[in-house]
């Protein structure tokens, strides 16, 4: 069994209000202790993320700088791929070949969106009113909550998070 996992809230790891056993569906064995995030923890995490989003350290970044951070994240995922694939195998019961493949795709998703981070632009929209203008602006959506199925957490999280940029 691995060490207990923790919540990450406001830049720090912490234990949840309680823990639960995560069972490997392929073996029926407990493979890890997972933290429960209850209403208080979720509210604190959302508040911390909202505050961080407004902080100049993030809000002041250009799209190109944000893209570079996504490239760095992709590199970190790739470096940790064997461990991440093992976690996914333990948690989902999938074979390691499949989870290894999915982790590689996760890194590629982040690289793809890193590459287009500074290339998305708004559009001027022609309309039939001479005294009006219409245009679109592409902006990050902000803090989100995403629920993904248990059987492909990292892969489906990458798909959801990256399309929101």
Model-derived features: where do they sit?
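Conserved small-residue-rich beta-alpha loop and adjacent elements
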Residues: 123-165
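Glycine-rich loop-to-alpha-helix module at the N-terminal edge of alpha/beta enzyme cores
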Residues: 31-121
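Residue-level signature of catalytic and energy-coupling elements of molecular machines
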Residues: 11, 28, 66, 110, ...
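Hydrophobic face of amphipathic alpha-helices that form TPR/SEL1-like repeat modules
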Residues: 1-27, 52
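Short glycine/serine/threonine-biased micro-segments
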Residues: 9, 14, 91, 120, ...
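Gly/Ser/Thr-rich helix-start
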Residues: 12, 94, 116, 123, ...
């Amino acid at each position: 069994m691995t060490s207990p996992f923790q919540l990450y809230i406001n830049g720090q790891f912490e234990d949840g209000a309680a823990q639960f056993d995560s069972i490997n569906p392929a073996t029926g064995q407990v493979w890890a202790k997972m933290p429960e995030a209850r209403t208080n923890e979720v509210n604190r995490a959302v508040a911390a993320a909202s505050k961080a989003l407004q902080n100049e350290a993030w809000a002041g970044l250009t799209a190109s700088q944000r893209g570079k951070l996504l490239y760095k994240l992709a590199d970190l995922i790739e470096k940790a791929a064997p461990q991440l694939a093992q976690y996914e195998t333990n948690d989902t019961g999938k074979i390691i070949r499949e989870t290894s493949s999915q982790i590689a795709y996760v890194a590629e998703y982040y690289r793809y969106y890193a590459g287009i981070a500074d290339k998305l632009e708004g559009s001027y929209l022609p309309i039939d009113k001479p005294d009006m203008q219409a245009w679109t602006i592409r902006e990050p959506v902000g803090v989100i909550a995403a629920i993904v199925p248990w059987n492909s957490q990292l892969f489906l999280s990458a798909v959801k998070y990256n399309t929101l940029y």
